[in-house]
């Protein structure tokens, strides 16, 4: 069974309310994301998980599969965890609804990894940080990687004395996250860690490696 994709969506974005319905070339931003996902060679099933009827009504004319969820979720991971209870699946890729430039090639690479890896329970796509200025941008999440495993995620790092010595170990999180279904449901039940609250990144829970 190929992994499915779920795009969590809500209108009450803290930094940019209603962002995912922003019109881009005649389509809502999130519809661009959905169509980018459908360009993948391996993903057949794409769902939008939302609590907002406005999102549902905006996307249904395009043929989107909508799963309505509770409005009590504080992050996309818990929203997707509720949605997967209504779907027969084994592995789920979570795609952010504000990534209209998502590369299908990245999604293909992650999907192939999931299909060939039956030991891991969670995956997170990362990319290189090309220059030191990127390291200090607060607009995206960074992570430290040891032996191909993420051990810490953060937005604002401490100052590094020598960027060249660290750039192979510090990478940017690309917004493609995947889970085994059972693990995702259990993960959503865990309480938020203090660092998760500080960094505003929902996949930092109890030092679980990804």
Q: How would you label these PLM feature ranges?
A:
Residues 2-50:
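N-terminal glycine-rich phosphate-binding loop and ensuing alpha1 helix
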Residues 20-24, 67-69, 192-193:
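Short glycine-enriched, charge-decorated loop/helix-capping segments at active-site entrances
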Residues 103-193, 207:
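Conserved core of the sugar-phosphate nucleotidyltransferase
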Residues 29-32, 79, 202:
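Well-ordered alpha-helical segments embedded in enzymatic catalytic cores
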Residues 43, 89, 117-120:
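Short, high-confidence coil segments that cap the C-terminus of an alpha-helix
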Residues 47, 53-112:
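Short phosphate-binding loop-to-helix
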Residues 197-210:
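A short, conserved alpha-helix in the catalytic core of glycosyltransferases
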């Amino acid at each position: 069974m190929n992994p499915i994709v779920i795009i969590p969506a809500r209108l009450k974005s803290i930094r940019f309310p209603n962002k995912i319905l922003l019109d881009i070339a005649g389509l809502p931003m999130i519809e661009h994301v959905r169509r980018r996902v459908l360009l993948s060679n391996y993903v057949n099933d794409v769902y939008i998980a939302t609590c907002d009827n406005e999102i549902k009504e905006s996307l249904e004319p395009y043929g989107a599969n909508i799963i309505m969820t509770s409005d009590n979720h504080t992050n996309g991971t818990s929203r997707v965890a509720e949605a997967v209870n209504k779907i027969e699946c084994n592995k789920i890729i979570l795609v952010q609804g504000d990534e209209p430039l998502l590369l299908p090639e990245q999604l293909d690479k992650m999907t192939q990894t999931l299909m060939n890896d039956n030991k891991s329970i969670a995956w997170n796509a990362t990319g290189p940080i090309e220059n030191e200025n990127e390291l200090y941008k607060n607009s995206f999440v960074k992570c430290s990687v040891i032996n191909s495993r993420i051990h810490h995620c953060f937005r604002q790092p401490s100052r590094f004395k020598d960027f060249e010595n660290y750039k192979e170990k510090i990478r940017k999180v690309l917004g493609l996250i995947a889970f085994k279904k059972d693990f995702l449901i259990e993960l959503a039940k865990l309480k938020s860690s203090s660092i998760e609250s500080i960094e505003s990144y929902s996949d930092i829970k109890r030092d679980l490696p990804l």
